Regions:
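Noncatalytic, solvent-exposed loop/strand surfaces
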Residues: 1-321
């Protein structure tokens, strides 16, 4: 892709993730990719370009670039363009035309990928977390259904998690923390919507929700587990073999059988046991790759897809042919 709009200078945090941090998505007919100020692109399954739509050319006060990934809903491609124009946009999947736009200055520094789930009344709702607020939008037309104030300010990087009509939010800097709140309602939701609030937090990675536990490795090299039902801390443990300085982890954890995996930037992939007790099971490195491993891995049919800044790897158990 040849850039058509000027990007932020390649300096600071941009050198750690670049201009193509978003994960592409597909509906089986087209592949959609987001490249920040160069907009959203659609190609067919043979790689032929179909359309390109600009979503703005602004920069936040941090000038960190974009990170959120695209999501699909019905015939729409939804993009968090908080960096480019302080807005959430829905594009028509076939043409790239803007169907709706939800704007707000508070969206600046909202880096997480939105999520669509069912509200308490059974209606689809698009959940967007921003510094100081969380929104529930109608994904068909972008209209605001509900919103609530929260204590996570500064910048919010992790994406929200949802299960059983409960939304979990993480992030913030310097006022960081986490919360769980009940889905549902209309208009402004009060404090009674929140089930719990905690100072435990993840700065960049989106935690893994498994049964009644939330697991993550933070950007200081500490493994966390808190109880999803009440926010109680179950363990907080520094991980042996993981560098403790320089933000050693950006990737989010993924579930792999009876354990969870998370790549570190420089010290390999760590496997930890699920459950309320800390147990480091393995640390695996790719010794001839000295570049950063910043992205979240994907698992497909027993194979682990792992990307560094220079190489894409497909790994499988040596017991499988």
């Amino acid at each position: 892709v040849t850039p058509e709009n000027p990007e932020d200078p390649f300096e600071g945090y941009l050198t750690e993730h670049g201009y193509a941090s978003s994960t592409p998505t597909t509906d089986g007919q087209r592949v959609y990719a987001f490249f920040g100020k160069d907009g959203v692109h659609a190609v067919d399954l043979d790689g032929n370009r179909l359309w390109q739509t600009s979503v703005g050319t602004q920069s936040s006060n941090r000038r960190w670039g974009s990170a959120a990934s695209l999501i699909l809903h019905e015939d729409l491609v939804i993009v968090n363009a908080s960096e480019e124009q302080r807005a959430i946009l829905a594009l028509e999947a076939e043409t790239g035309k803007v169907r709706w736009r939800a704007e707000g200055a508070i969206l600046e520094l909202a880096y997480g990928t939105p999520l669509i789930t069912k509200d308490a009344d059974g209606q689809n709702v698009l959940i967007v977390i921003a510094p100081g607020e969380i929104w529930g939008l109608n994904p068909t037309n972008g209209k605001l259904r509900w919103y609530a104030a929260h204590s996570l300010t500064g910048n919010v990087c992790p994406s929200v998690l949802v299960r059983d009509q409960i939304v979990f939010g993480f992030g913030g800097f310097r006022s960081s923390g986490s919360f769980a709140m009940k889905l549902g309602g209309r208009g402004e939701l009060g404090k009674d919507a929140f089930i719990w609030q905690s100072r435990a937090s993840s700065y960049v990675a989106t935690p893994l929700l498994h049964e009644d536990h939330l697991h993550w490795l933070d950007d200081r090299g500490i493994a966390w587990c808190i109880r999803a039902s009440d926010g109680k801390e179950l363990y907080r443990q520094r991980v042996e073999g993981l560098q403790a300085t320089g933000r050693p982890v950006y990737a989010s954890p993924v579930l792999a059988g009876d354990h969870w995996l998370v790549p570190s930037r420089w010290d390999g992939v760590f496997a930890l046991a699920l459950g309320s007790t800390f147990q480091l099971l393995a640390q695996n490195r790719i010794p001839d790759d000295a570049s950063d491993f910043n992205s979240t891995p994907a698992i497909d049919r027993g194979e682990l897809l792992l990307r560094s800044n220079q190489t894409l790897y497909c790994l499988r158990s040596d017991t499988k042919s």
